């Protein structure tokens, strides 16, 4: 046997077997590092460990199982709360907290208190907690199931079923209850994760903005109300849906759309004699308010006749309509909102108005609007009372069945009621009797002193009609003032109190303060000349306008600073009639020789209910004009909240009021000239021009009477 190869040497001098041994030493770790051999080696090592301890430490395995179950439940809670709390609309929660049941109010207040701390803060806290839980679960299951694909599959199944599907399905239906129950737990987590969650939530608020819930437009609200008719537990009826939808459209709807055209309106002239035929015609018309116009001017309305005034009138007296007190008949433009006109009707001043293209002029009337028209628009149906002849005035649909009292006998019935009541009062106690409106002996010639023809006795009563008349002095006929003007016993400016809690009467505004300046006439100065047809104002009248403009500017500043209504009046002499009374001009009266006076009156009042009321007297006829206020519903801030910016606003108001007064009195001069030029058209009536307007802090108004 030859040992030559073993003894052979390399060029370096080292034997070959040395290299072979070193090669095997360095390649052994690479072979055993393969996955198959490595796994079998680990498995063999565990078998060796299991052979000494059988199944292993059962206590630690049980602990891992319990931790896994807790993590699965926490993941489900976080996933459900994310949907339950974030899915709650803040507006819906506010509605439930005020109008829900007692239990719903408590739950909604808990959730609102949590969300009010920051909706993004709650969201980041829940998402961060859910991620931590889901990432920890596979690690714990690896200790229980031995790792590998078993832990991955098990954690996935548990998270999907018990951490997502079941919790979110429950919270979709019971999100409010579940969210309110876990509110304390979520609040603790929010503060535990404050260092991480709050900065992220602040960044989201800055980038995305805060979410305060879903707000609907009017069209969306109408759709929502309509859906409540067919869906939900408490379904709305058809009438409820109609009324709610009509209310939402009331502000955008114009009075021109619901008015009665002027050609379909029952009107009468002021010189109409109320005989048997005319009274029967009035009662057969079925109207309780009749617009009255000047003779030969069918579009120049001076007021409205309340039919109830004729309840004690004897048609044999044959008195003209101008003899009776007429209620104020305001005028408004066709573009006035129905909501604004409804607010005006609620003030108790009038329940009828004239729709005119040129409010305040002697022409331009296109229709009439009543409170009943607005209410009919609200309910979407026609209202037919006992005395109505037409079911629908616009379509001329007459009612098929008459009212409770036949129209054919109503005149004779009222006449019989009047005469029988008169006889009973004569036979009754003298303390309780009341005389008729006019003495029968003077029926054809009315007394020159109507107050002497009325009984001065009055009584106090409390009837079952809902009105408290204990503090009101009433009379069976309209009262007569010291100026001879007949006014109703229950004035709209001072309505009676109502005992019923469900009835509300809006009281008129307080009487404004008066700032009056007079221009005295000495004995040397000539009295004001009678009215002429000059087309220019005299120097004295222009000076009055200039002085009044300065006083008006000061009054505007006073009203803006104090918030109190103010009135400025400048006159050349004291007027005989009360400014609040309305005198109806009588035909045939000669006013050409009477001394004329000039009265300029400006009133400043806070605008209410979105309307500005003005009074214009054209050719002796006072007209009330109703117009919408500018941005009235966006400017309701109290005076006390504007103290900081008051100084700056007063400076700007000085400039604005000066310019507004200049333009205002310029227009008054022009209109005054135009009226003077056209006075020959009606020489038998009092020639006058008057303008009074109510303004808030945004403007002013003026009155001129000539």
UniProtKB/Swiss-Prot annotation:
InterPro entries: ACDP, CBS_dom, CBS_dom_sf, CNNM, Ion_transp-like_CBS. One of its GO terms (molecular function) is transmembrane transporter activity. Residues 630-639 have a biased composition (Basic and acidic residues). Residues 259-320, 321-386 form the CBS domain. The chain crosses the membrane at residues 17-37, 66-86, 121-141, 146-166, 178-198. Keywords: Membrane, Phosphoprotein, Repeat, Transmembrane, Transmembrane helix, Vacuole. The modification Phosphothreonine is found at residue 607. Residues 433-445, 566-575, 658-680 have a biased composition (Low complexity). The modification Phosphoserine is found at residues 439, 447, 527, 603, 614. Residues 1-16, 87-120, 167-177 are vacuolar. Residues 57-240 form the CNNM transmembrane domain. Residues 421-495, 515-540, 557-597, 626-706 are annotated as: Disordered. The modification Phosphotyrosine is found at residue 604. Residues 38-65, 142-145, 199-706 are cytoplasmic. It is a multi-pass membrane protein. It is found in: Vacuole membrane. GO terms for biological process: intracellular magnesium ion homeostasis; intracellular manganese ion homeostasis; mitochondrion organization. Residues 472-495, 576-597, 681-706 have a biased composition (Polar residues). The keyword Heme does not apply. One of its GO terms (cellular component) is fungal-type vacuole membrane. Present with 2270 molecules/cell in log phase SD medium. Involved in metal homeostasis and more specially in manganese sensitivity. Belongs to the ACDP family. This is Protein MAM3. The gene is MAM3.
